[in-house]
């Protein structure tokens, strides 16, 4: 069967790309499927000036809260939950069960399933759903009084309120509303649900925020661990998937592939997210600082990826480093194993998301005739990023082929449809899928063979 060669976007193709005066980026793993129907509240994501409300807490740190629209969109996207305007106790219990960890032993019971969910029961159920019931039970009256500070809540539920406040399930303003024990509306129920999901580790999976100094430290801790392994292949322990990928290269179906551990996926909201690619961790840290300097606060996740492409002996560059290694896979067939990164950025609103493109073009893109211009460290001729939903007419649609096995996912981005040959080579042990994503104009030019 005739094998169609395709242009694949890889952060690892640095040497090859340098021949054309640019550095090449890497492909990112598949994000959550964006096609699911979202609640009407999602429409306001483009209208709100911000989704993040920063409120002080007793420790003096920032507590960031998403808007009602973002919470509703996320609950629908990842948990398929849309509350009725008048939420029942059973609705809330069912929703809480969906945000439990797969190995959770928490059991929930509603006293009156059909009754409207009220403030006191909502807090008690949320505390139980977050696995904190035993903690609440050991609260002394002295500790309860010190935490509640005048909130009019009595009886056993008072300990749940105190526990919810101390653990961040609710803030004081919201606790005052819930303490009135009135019917809980959909927005408040969703907010409580998202707080529980965050506690349970079933919501977003991220390094932090662009305005949090500790985000940089978390990124470097990850990077130091990767460097200590001294081998790019340490990022993927799945020999089955790697062998499939090498066969794809040997058959000429693709020129390279990337593999990521799907457990690192940020689980961000697709309509507010951009995936940005680079192979230099210093550059990524500077992008975070750039966003913060512009007043753009967004969620950040860094996902390292194992990138592989064919090596040609005439390149004469087989000296190994912690991020680069030439490996012989068959007679006269060599591959390069490299490490790259993609940074997931979930913006507060659509306006900030659109602003990202202009920022990168201004300070993180090389241009002919501007050799003396100050840029971020190791900026590329063609900075590259993508979205799993349409952005605007400056982004272009391409194919996204994925092959998964165990907890690992291989991605091959192409201009042409190569699903059929991938299915034939992947075998029955792997799952092959195809989708679409949208890439920025520089990424598009790279995939079409242009050098700037």
Please provide the spans of the model-predicted regions.
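Eukaryote-specific, cytoplasm-facing alpha-helical/coiled-coil scaffolding segments in long proteins
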Residues: 190, 216-221, 312-318
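Sec-dependent N-terminal signal peptides of Gram-positive bacterial secreted proteins and lipoproteins
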Residues: 3-26
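Solvent-exposed, polar/charged alpha-helical surfaces in well-ordered, non-transmembrane soluble domains
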Residues: 90, 94, 121-124, 158-162, ...
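Feature responds to low-complexity, polar/acidic, surface-exposed segments characteristic
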Residues: 24, 28-90, 98-118, 127-157, ...
């Amino acid at each position: 069967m005739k094998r169609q060669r395709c242009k694949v976007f890889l952060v690892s193709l640095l040497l090859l790309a340098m021949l054309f005066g640019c550095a090449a980026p890497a492909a990112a793993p598949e994000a959550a499927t964006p096609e699911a129907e979202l609640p009407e509240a999602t429409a306001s994501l483009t209208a709100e000036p911000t989704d993040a409300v920063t409120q002080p807490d007793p420790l003096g740190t920032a507590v960031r809260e998403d808007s009602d629209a973002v919470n509703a969109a996320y609950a629908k996207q990842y948990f398929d939950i849309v509350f009725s305007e008048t939420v029942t106790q059973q609705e809330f219990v069912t929703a809480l069960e969906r945000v439990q960890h797969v190995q959770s032993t928490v059991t929930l019971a509603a006293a009156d399933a059909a009754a409207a969910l009220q403030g006191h029961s909502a807090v008690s159920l949320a505390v139980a759903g977050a696995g904190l019931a035993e903690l609440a039970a050991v609260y002394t009256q002295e500790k309860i009084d010190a935490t509640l500070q005048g909130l009019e809540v009595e009886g056993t539920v008072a300990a749940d309120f105190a526990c919810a406040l101390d653990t961040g399930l609710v803030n004081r303003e919201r606790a005052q509303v819930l303490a009135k024990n009135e019917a809980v509306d959909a927005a408040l129920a969703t907010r409580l649900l998202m707080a529980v999901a965050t506690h349970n580790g079933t919501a977003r999976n991220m390094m932090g925020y662009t305005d949090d100094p500790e985000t940089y430290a978390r990124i470097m801790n990850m990077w130091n661990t990767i460097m200590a392994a001294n081998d790019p292949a340490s990022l993927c322990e799945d020999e089955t998937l790697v062998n499939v990928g090498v066969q794809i290269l040997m058959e000429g179906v693709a020129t390279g592939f990337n593999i990521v551990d799907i457990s690192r996926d940020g689980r961000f909201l697709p309509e507010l997210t951009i995936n940005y690619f680079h192979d230099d961790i210093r550059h990524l840290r500077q992008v975070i600082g750039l966003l913060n300097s512009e007043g753009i606060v967004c969620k950040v996740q860094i996902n390292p990826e194992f990138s592989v492409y064919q090596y040609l002996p005439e390149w004469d560059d087989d000296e190994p480093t912690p991020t680069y290694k030439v490996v012989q896979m068959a007679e006269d067939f060599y591959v390069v194993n490299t490490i790259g990164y993609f940074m997931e950025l979930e913006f507060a609103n659509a306006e900030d998301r659109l602003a990202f493109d202009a920022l990168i073009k201004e300070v993180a893109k090389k241009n002919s005739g501007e050799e003396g211009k100050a840029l971020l460290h190791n900026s590329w001729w063609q900075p590259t990023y993508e979205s799993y939903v349409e952005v605007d007419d400056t982004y272009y649609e391409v194919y996204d082929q994925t092959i998964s096995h165990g907890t690992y996912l291989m991605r091959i981005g192409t201009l042409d449809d190569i699903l059929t040959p991938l299915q034939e080579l992947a075998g029955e042990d792997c799952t092959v899928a195809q989708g679409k994503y949208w890439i920025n104009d520089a990424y598009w030019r790279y995939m079409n063979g242009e050098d700037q």
